Amino acid sequence: MSDALLHADNLHYRAGGRTLIEGVSLTLAPGEMVALIGPNGAGKSTLLRLLSGYLDPIQGQCRLQGRELAVWTAAQLARRRAVMAQQGSVAFSFRVSEVVAMARAPWSGTPATTVLAEVMTLTGCEMLASREFRRLSGGEQQRVRLAMALAQLWQQDGPEGWLFLDEPTSALDLYHQQALLRLLYQLTRAGKLAVCCILHDVNLAALWADRILLLQQGRLAASGTPAEVLTEVQLRACYQADLRVQTQQEDGVPQIYLRR
């Protein structure tokens, strides 16, 4: 097993008397963008929490760079993986610049000014720097959370490690959806960052993911390229939706249409 991987082996998780994740095995590697899709209640957020170390499986294990997640200290793990949650509250009246600066806590004692300026620019947050975080719109807050996640993982020339995102586009308009996913895709091309994000929009997953993981009732129903996973037969069976899949002539990307 390569030390540069995050490897999950036979993960199981139960809560409230229900099995939420059952027998999931997968590998995440730097240099790729992975989309986690599936219907409501499939277990996507639970799996993300298991992969990022926020939950412990009742069976199976996750290994990051050859070591079980359970043996990493919180400080060590904070330098190697970051999580952008759907929502997060800030209890006090902090400005955006102050909120983003908090993400550099794992790197205390190292210069942060250049890093913060870089991530604020990349995420389009520089014009928000002096505003109070709690006063921002939902979409603006999502962009700030992305800036925080990138700041947490930023090393000499860019982010390194594993970045997990739970529905990062849910509050964004079309322009900012494209900008966020395009940025994540470009950052992974350097080969030092692995991105795993939950997406409800399967067309966004088709457009930007190198690999798609399709989760159904806590099990991994399919894993592969967008063309391999996003087939009519597979999507109809999983989502129970009346849909069509066509391939874009321009770039060969599958495009999913709902029928009336």
Swiss-Prot record:
Localization annotation: Cell inner membrane
Lipid bilayer topology: Peripheral membrane protein
PROSITE patterns assigned: ABC_TRANSPORTER_1, ABC_TRANSPORTER_2, HMUV
Transmembrane segments: none
Residues reported in the UniProt entry to bind ATP: 38-45
Keywords: ATP-binding, Cell inner membrane, Cell membrane, Membrane, Nucleotide-binding, Translocase, Transport
PANTHER family: HEMIN IMPORT ATP-BINDING PROTEIN HMUV
Family in the record: Belongs to the ABC transporter superfamily. Heme (hemin) importer (TC 3.A.1.14.5) family.
UniProt-recorded name of the protein: Hemin import ATP-binding protein HmuV
Gene assigned in the entry: hmuV
